[in-house]
Amino acid sequence: MPRCRRCTLRVLLTNDDGIDAPGLEALRSTVEYAFGDELERVYTLAPDCQRSECGHGVSSGKPLRIVETGSSAWSASGTPADCVRFALTSLCPDVDLVFSGINAGANLGTDLMVSGTFAAAREAHNRGVPAIAISHYRRPDVPRTWQHTPTWLASTLRDLLARIGRGEGRLWNINLPAIDPDSLSPGSIPPAVFCPVDRTPIPLAYLPATVAGELDIQTARDFYVESDFHNRPRQPGSDIDVCFGGKISISLAEQY
């Protein structure tokens, strides 16, 4: 439980895109910008490689390799959930808050069931530490920049810390919209909206790797999954609707 905003904070940063991902550096810059001198120490423990869509998988039956990569920073050979488990039991059990992200791509609606980014936050919450998962919706037609994340997120993160301190929720999911910061007027920030997590499943189609000949379910075949992420169905006012509509979505996600 964070002590208070007038006191110092110890935080853990993690992600599912890996220790070298630009979104992790953006997360560190964002947290430092939002909390400044209130930070006592920032720990980082993230997977040593890309672990997107690994869900809440954990490693068992094999060693977890931890490598120091910098000041108060380490990589792990496991999943995002492994990182949080190790950190909260063996590395920094006294942290006040866990941040996971910033994911290069949205984690909205039922995506939370497979998101490694959100699983890391959920693991922290399950172990009694409040957590915030952060993702950034991306589109092919919008530049993939990170420099704007501190100004876009600072107010929201401070607000959520205050809510956590008041007992108004301890597991939050944030998604930034796919907007070119340069398209906004100077100093403008997309509005932040509190909204529920959409429970509408994304439609899927499994297509054979080769369509020649008849499908024989008795024979091994390769299939590709196809979905239309950007045009997925959504409920009005849900996290998908809010984020795809150009606003910052903020969802209390303890039910996940």
Regions found by a protein language model. Name each.
Residues H148-Y256:
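Electrostatically charged, flexible surface regions
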Residues D17-E25, E226:
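Short acidic, Gly/Ser-rich segments with clustered Asp/Glu that frequently serve as metal-coordination loops
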